């Protein structure tokens, strides 16, 4: 049984979820920098860790997590109820392709729990979480465009190899990428992930010439310790910092 993952303001119980909390997810949540979002949707919420991190970082926001895996949703609900943010965090069992929000959404965060072109896992719950053959980056971006209000904010965590693909998908659906944060484990390893921040444009005010700012994030130094950059980023969440 997986142990609970304790943070400074909340604890994530994860014994029933398809995929446990990872350091990459924590880094992504800590990197999230919504400017104006007050209604945030966490797509593929899993344990609820990103939803809870968003509630901690943005005290005026309401956060809803959505996931297709019922045991994960049930456990995320418990995590939300037991957190200081119970009045602002909720979790829904639904397919994001069918979901229709009750209130307009102006912020979406998503750590897509799938890897295109990877073989399915032999374990069914991990297969469900990590391999959705009919759910591509293009369909995800299209769905986010439909759900978000104009000028809404989108945050995605993706494999670094997906950069060209996601930039093309964002352009197709009238998003302007603002920043791309490359995430590498150590200074000598190439980035394995990117965190993409984009804004949904009005159809009448869309330009493909918007400059994209690139930021580099390195988690560990050569001696295996957290970098000062990582320590500063995660000190509001990790107990040991």
Segment roles from a protein language model:
Residues 28, 111, 140, 198:
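Residue-level signal for inorganic ion chemistry
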Residues 9, 60-62, 86-88, 151, ...:
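A generic structural signal for alpha->beta connector loops
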Residues 17, 21, 135-187, 191:
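Conserved Class I SAM-dependent methyltransferase catalytic core
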Residues 2-39, 45-47, 52-57, 209-219:
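SAM-dependent Rossmann-like transferase core, predominantly class I methyltransferases
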Residues 13, 90-92, 178-181:
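General small-molecule cofactor/ligand-binding pocket signal
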Residues 190-241:
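SAM/dcSAM-binding transferase cores
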Residues 112-139:
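Mobile active-site "lid"/loop adjacent to the S-adenosyl-L-methionine
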């Amino acid at each position: 049984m997986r142990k609970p993952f304790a943070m400074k303001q909340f604890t994530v119980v994860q014994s029933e979820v398809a995929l446990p909390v990872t350091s990459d997810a924590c880094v992504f949540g800590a990197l999230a920098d919504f400017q104006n979002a007050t209604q945030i949707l966490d797509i593929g919420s899993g344990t609820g860790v990103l939803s809870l991190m968003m509630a901690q970082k943005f005290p005026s926001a309401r956060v809803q997590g959505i996931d297709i895996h019922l045991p994960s949703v049930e456990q995320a609900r418990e995590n939300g109820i037991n957190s200081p943010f119970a009045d602002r965090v909720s979790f829904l069992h639904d397919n994001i392709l069918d979901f229709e929000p009750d209130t307009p959404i102006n912020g979406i965060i998503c750590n897509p729990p799938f890897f295109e072109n990877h073989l399915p896992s032999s374990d069914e719950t991990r297969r469900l979480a990590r391999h959705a053959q009919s759910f591509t980056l293009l369909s995800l971006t299209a769905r986010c465009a439909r759900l978000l209000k104009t000028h809404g904010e989108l945050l995605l965590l993706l494999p670094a190899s997906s950069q060209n693909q996601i930039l093309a998908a964002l352009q197709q659906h009238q998003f302007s990428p603002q920043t791309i944060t490359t995430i590498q484990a150590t200074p000598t390893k190439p980035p394995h992930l990117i965190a993409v921040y984009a804004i949904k444009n009005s159809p009448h005010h869309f330009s493909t010439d918007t400059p994209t700012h690139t930021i580099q994030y390195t988690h560990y130094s050569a001696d295996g310790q957290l970098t000062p950059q990582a320590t500063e980023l995660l000190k509001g969440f990790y107990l040991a910092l």
